[in-house]
Each structure stands twice: as structure tokens, then as C-alpha cells.
């Protein structure tokens, strides 16, 4: 049986934890950077977006029990202090460990594979968008993989269809993006004036790494795409708008047919 651990139980980590438990996968250990076991339990049971998780919760010492399943917990900021003996797969959802130099510390503790919930711009790390390039994964080569980013997962299937069938000359990407923990609730002094504005009262233009992440999947598009994000005061929905100039003439009919065919074929269940 494969033993799984999660480091970081924020927005993404919480949802992954729920999926692992719901699908009866062997989650052995969870580390959260903040709080304690009781605040973690409360955060899992009561979610501001998805409501109450109808599961049985119990906390004993440093052990969390969900539907009777025992999960060892800790609350550390340092990878070296984590309890990773016998862990096969570590899912890093901290949002801060985004370099191979830092992530290698997991292997020193005995972890066999690391999956990161954020994109990493390093050639030795596979940025995987399921349905688009999962075939590049080589178990003997890739010890660290990422699931890219939410925006990259949104646009990569679209780009796959257009670029592989017609060819993209260049393009622009705009994402209307949920607010995140990297922002501030109230106005504060900040070296980036936009980042210092209240997340709950403003539409905040900022950067997005999605265009760069796409070039990791399609190297020939490097420098041909640009993008920006607008952070908006919502938590659970985003929208991405793409404008492309194609390499050859096309039509609405051709484009729609390509998307329909892909949605019923290789991208079924991914492309709506």
C-alpha cells in the first residue's frame, strides 16, 4: 500500500485531503504550517465554501481521526522536522516550497516522490496538465512533479486543441482570479502599490505565470504568449479569457468542431 502525506492544509491541501479520504487512499500524515490539531479539525469540518464535511472527526494528542482513519499530524515550518518515515508520496501544498533545492529535503527524509501544487520553472521538474502532457512523466527520471497552476490547467487544453491543429502565432491571456492568502485584507503599505490594496474591496491587476508555464509544455510558444491576472474578491470561481492570432486562416465553424471533437475524445471529462 502506498503511504501518502500532505504538507500544507490551506485551500488546495484541504481539498486534496478530502479527496484522499473519500477515495480510501492511505493518507498517513499531515503537516500544517499554522494553528494546532483542533483548529485543523475545525477547518476541515466546516468550510466557508463547501459547507460542512459530513464525516466523523476526532482529535487525540497529535492524531486526527476521520471516519475512524488515523492520521498523524504536526505543525512545523521546517521540512527537516517533519515525520516522513515510510512516506512514499509527499504532496506539498504550502505554496512556498517551489525549488528543487528546497524540495530535495523531502528525499533526505526518505520520501520517494514529491507532488507540488504550484508550477515550478525548472527543466528537471515535470509540470503536468492532465489530458495535455501527462505522457511526459518518466518514473525513473521525475522524482518531483507539479500539477502546474489553476490557470494553466484552464488554458492548456484550449491551447492544445488550437496549437496542435492550426498553430498559434501569438496570444494574450487574461485571468479573472480568486483572491489568495498572498494578499492583504485591508490596505497596507507595500512596495507593490497594487498588492497593498485590500483584497476584499478591489479588483487588483497583477502578474500570472500561466503564459510561462505553457511554454514549459509547448517550448515553441516561448515568448509568444503574455498574460496578466485580475484578483477579485471571490473564493471559488475564476475565468480565463484568451485571444490568439493563428498561423493560418480559420473559421468559427472549424474552431467549434475542433473543440467538440476533442471534448468527446482525448479531452473527454476535461474540456467542457
Which ranges hold each PLM region?
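Active-site-lining helix/loop region of Rossmann-like oxidoreductase modules
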Residues: 3, 7, 11-18, 25-26, ...
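Short glycine-aromatic motifs
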Residues: 57, 270-271
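N-terminal Rossmann-like NAD(P) cofactor-binding subdomain of oxidoreductases
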Residues: 1-185, 189-196
Amino acid at each position: 500500500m502506498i503511504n501518502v502525506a500532505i504538507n500544507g492544509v490551506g485551500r488546495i491541501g484541504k481539498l486534496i485531503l478530502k479527496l484522499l479520504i473519500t477515495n480510501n487512499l492511505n493518507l498517513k500524515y499531515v503537516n500544517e504550517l499554522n494553528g494546532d490539531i483542533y483548529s485543523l479539525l475545525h477547518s476541515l469540518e466546516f468550510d466557508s465554501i463547501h459547507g460542512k464535511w459530513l464525516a466523523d472527526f476526532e482529535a487525540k494528542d497529535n492524531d486526527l481521526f476521520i471516519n475512524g482513519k488515523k492520521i498523524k499530524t504536526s505543525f512545523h515550518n521546517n521540512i527537516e522536522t517533519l515525520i516522513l518515515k515510510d512516506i512514499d508520496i509527499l504532496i506539498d501544498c504550502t505554496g512556498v516550497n517551489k525549488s528543487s533545492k528546497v524540495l530535495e529535503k523531502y528525499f533526505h527524509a526518505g520520501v520517494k516522490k514529491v507532488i507540488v501544487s504550484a508550477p515550478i520553472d525548472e527543466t528537471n521538474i515535470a509540470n503536468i496538465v492532465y489530458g495535455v502532457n501527462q505522457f511526459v512523466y518518466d518514473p525513473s527520471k521525475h522524482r518531483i512533479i507539479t500539477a502546474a497552476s489553476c490557470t494553466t490547467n484552464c488554458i492548456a487544453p484550449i491551447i492544445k486543441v488550437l496549437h496542435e491543429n492550426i498553430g498559434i502565432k501569438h496570444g494574450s491571456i487574461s485571468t479573472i482570479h480568486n483572491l489568495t492568502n498572498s494578499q492583504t485584507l485591508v490596505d497596507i503599505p507595500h512596495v507593490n502599490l497594487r498588492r497593498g490594496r485590500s483584497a476584499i474591496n478591489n479588483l487588483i491587476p497583477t502578474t500570472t505565470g500561466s503564459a510561462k508555464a505553457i511554454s514549459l509544455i509547448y517550448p515553441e510558444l516561448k515568448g509568444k504568449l503574455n498574460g496578466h491576472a485580475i484578483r477579485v474578491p471571490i473564493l471559488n470561481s475564476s475565468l480565463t479569457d484568451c485571444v490568439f492570432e493563428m498561423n493560418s486562416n480559420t473559421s468559427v465553424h472549424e474552431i467549434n468542431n475542433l473543440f467538440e471533437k476533442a471534448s468527446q475524445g482525448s479531452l473527454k471529462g476535461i474540456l467542457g
